[in-house]
Amino acid sequence: MSKLKITQIKSGIATKPNHRETLRSLGLKRIGDTVIKEDRPEFRGMVRTVRHLVTMEEVD
């Protein structure tokens, strides 16, 4: 199964509370943090919610 590499590129300080919670759920705390998650619909939905704060790329 492929994986997603998710990197936070913008701060979550001046965002909606649910966006901050989504960043925390993904395991992102500060700009430049990167996590590797399985490519599942749940994670893609979270990334879609905060797409203006993160970048995503597929890795094997």
UniProtKB/Swiss-Prot annotation:
GO molecular function: structural constituent of ribosome
CDD domains: Ribosomal_L30 (cd01658)
InterPro entries: Ribo_uL30_ferredoxin-like_sf, Ribosomal_uL30_bac-type, Ribosomal_uL30_ferredoxin-like
GO cellular component, one term: cytosolic large ribosomal subunit
Gene3D superfamilies documented for this protein: Ribosomal protein L30, ferredoxin-like fold domain
Pfam families membership: Ribosomal_L30
Taxonomic superkingdom: Bacteria
UniProt keyword terms in alphabetical order: Ribonucleoprotein, Ribosomal protein
Range of residues in the leader sequence: none
Any GO BP: translation
Ribonucleoprotein in keyword set: yes
Subunit description: Part of the 50S ribosomal subunit.
Family label: Belongs to the universal ribosomal protein uL30 family.
Protein name: Large ribosomal subunit protein uL30
